[in-house]
């Protein structure tokens, strides 16, 4: 029985706003409970790959992933934005590095805690539930940056990262480079050079204790994809500057290392007073 379909449209919209299919999939995987996570874009679907995306061993990570984690280790404490099930947090903990995780998903945070990492918070990355100037680094890897939806939205998110970090902080963010990407799941083209979009939603299905099939449907997610050149444009009016760009040869996915100029952060703070 599909519980999501049997409710009135208004109720379904409210349920989707509150739904947490990705977090539930993480928690179910951690507890070795059955369930299936899929990405959906209209009739097209793609497997959610919960184990490989959120529970993979560090031995399987590529060099750019490890390099980004190592570079931030010297800037502790680190704020891991969109920490998910806590894989990167656990890596830092194993290396004696202080970090705190934040995720919008209550079930993802619960999963990270049950895996042994207690310093995790439920919160919105656009209004982070942490004090000003509290961290030496921000790690936001999982293409969350694209949820800004536009270059202006990314710029506002970077200002929030600036608020919670100390002078001369470092941030690592990631995205897919549209100049090297013709198609991916949920892909939407854009006439502007170095800009594209992804749109899809997540669904988690499981069998209930009553033997019925339950499906949790999340809201539609819109990601802005931008090239490193476009990311530099987004940082132009923020304290951040793009330093190194890390990626495997020919890969569309990249990580950008951002360095913070303290004077610009103070200028924004004074404007808001």
Segments and roles (model prediction):
Residues 116-128:
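Conserved SAM-binding strand-loop segment of SAM-dependent methyltransferases
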Residues 136-155:
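A short SAM/SAH-binding and catalytic strip from SAM-dependent methyltransferases
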Residues 172-226:
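SAM-dependent methyltransferase
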Residues 153-167:
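A short glycine-rich, Lys/Arg-flanked "PGG" loop and its adjoining helix->strand segment in the class I
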Residues 75-84:
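Conserved class I S-adenosyl-L-methionine
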Residues 105-107:
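Conserved SAM/SAH-binding beta-strand->alpha-helix loop
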Residues 1-40:
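N-terminal auxiliary segments of SAM/dcSAM-dependent transferases
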Residues 126-138:
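A short acidic, Gly/Pro-enriched loop at the edge of an enzyme's catalytic core
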């Amino acid at each position: 029985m599909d519980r999501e379909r049997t409710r009135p449209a208004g109720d379904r919209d409210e349920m989707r706003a509150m739904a947490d299919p990705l977090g539930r999939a993480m928690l179910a995987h951690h507890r070795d409970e059955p369930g299936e996570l899929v990405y959906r874009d209209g009739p097209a679907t793609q497997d959610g790959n919960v184990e490989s995306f959120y529970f993979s061993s560090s031995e399987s990570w590529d060099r750019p992933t490890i390099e980004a984690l190592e570079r931030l280790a010297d800037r502790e404490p680190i704020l891991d934005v969109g920490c998910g099930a806590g894989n990167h947090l656990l890596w830092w903990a194993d290396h004696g590095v202080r970090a705190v995780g934040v995720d919008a998903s209550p079930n993802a945070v619960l999963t990270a805690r049950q895996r042994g990492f207690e310093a995790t918070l439920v919160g919105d990355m656009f209004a982070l539930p942490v004090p000003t100037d509290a961290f030496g680094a921000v790690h936001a890897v999982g293409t969350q940056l694209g949820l800004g939806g536009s270059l202006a939205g990314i710029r506002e998110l970077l200002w929030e990262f600036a608020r919670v970090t100390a002078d001369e902080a470092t941030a690592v963010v990631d995205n897919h480079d549209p100049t090297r990407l013709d198609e991916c799941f949920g892909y939407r083209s854009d006439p502007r050079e170095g800009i594209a979009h992804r749109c899809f939603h997540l669904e988690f299905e499981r069998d209930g204790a009553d033997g019925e099939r339950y499906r949790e449907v999340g809201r539609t997610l819109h990601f802005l994809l931008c090239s490193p050149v476009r990311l530099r444009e987004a940082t132009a009016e923020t304290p951040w500057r793009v330093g190194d760009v890390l990626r495997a040869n020919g890969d569309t996915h990249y990580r950008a290392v951002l360095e913070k100029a303290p004077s610009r952060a103070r200028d924004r703070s004074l404007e808001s007073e």
